[in-house]
Amino acid sequence: MSAAMMNKSVVLSKQCTKPAATPKVVTSKRSFASTVANKNREMMVWQPFNNKMFETFSFLPPLTDEQISKQVDYILANSWTPCLEFAASDQAYAGNENCIRMGPVASTYQDNRYWTMWKLPMFGCTDGSQVLSEIQACTNAFPDAYIRLVCFDANRQVQISGFLVHRPPSATDYRLPADRQV
């Protein structure tokens, strides 16, 4: 290596080892309470009793027909297949009594419980009103059952989403969003 090249590499290495400018640290005088999103000054405690949830959207108030129809439009826009399922109140939540177990091996379907399918999957469905009429028919047939809408992707052969569309009037395991915190 020539002397000129060595001098050049020494100069380059000195430039690379220069310390970076230290950023100025800014401290805030605000307390944690002033940064809470809901503008509350107190932390809330989640109500642990009678506050069960189901899949997607269960933290929201019950969906209206218009909101369900919009979700169906989204499902159809993604080429997924909507399907209705229902379950009695005592079979709706996961538990040892209603989980299907085959010896020490458990089924690979979600949480090892199956809901009953309402008719067949809606392969030919083109809009939300068709699903809403099926929800109404299922509700009329089983008024004291939980009903959920699930959607399947035929290409990936998986369930994509599922959400509750009907909660029985006799259900006592649910709280409105305003009552979920202590």
Curated annotation (Swiss-Prot):
<keyword id="KW-0601">Photorespiration</keyword>
<dbReference type="GO" id="GO:0009853">
    <property type="term" value="P:photorespiration"/>
</dbReference>
<comment type="subunit">
    <text>Heterohexadecamer of 8 large and 8 small subunits.</text>
</comment>
<dbReference type="InterPro" id="IPR000894">
    <property type="entry name" value="RuBisCO_ssu_dom"/>
</dbReference>
<keyword id="KW-0809">Transit peptide</keyword>
<dbReference type="InterPro" id="IPR024681">
    <property type="entry name" value="RuBisCO_ssu"/>
</dbReference>
<comment type="function">
    <text>RuBisCO catalyzes two reactions: the carboxylation of D-ribulose 1,5-bisphosphate, the primary event in carbon dioxide fixation, as well as the oxidative fragmentation of the pentose substrate. Both reactions occur simultaneously and in competition at the same active site. Although the small subunit is not catalytic it is essential for maximal activity.</text>
</comment>
<protein>
    <recommendedName>
        <fullName>Ribulose bisphosphate carboxylase small subunit, chloroplastic 4</fullName>
    </recommendedName>
</protein>
<keyword id="KW-0120">Carbon dioxide fixation</keyword>
<comment type="similarity">
    <text>Belongs to the RuBisCO small chain family.</text>
</comment>
<dbReference type="InterPro" id="IPR036385">
    <property type="entry name" value="RuBisCO_ssu_sf"/>
</dbReference>
<keyword id="KW-0150">Chloroplast</keyword>
<dbReference type="GO" id="GO:0016984">
    <property type="term" value="F:ribulose-bisphosphate carboxylase activity"/>
</dbReference>
<keyword id="KW-0602">Photosynthesis</keyword>
<dbReference type="GO" id="GO:0019253">
    <property type="term" value="P:reductive pentose-phosphate cycle"/>
</dbReference>
<feature type="transit peptide" description="Chloroplast">
    <location>
        <begin position="1"/>
        <end position="41"/>
    </location>
</feature>
<dbReference type="Pfam" id="PF00101">
    <property type="entry name" value="RuBisCO_small"/>
</dbReference>
<keyword id="KW-0113">Calvin cycle</keyword>
<keyword id="KW-0934">Plastid</keyword>
<dbReference type="GO" id="GO:0009507">
    <property type="term" value="C:chloroplast"/>
</dbReference>
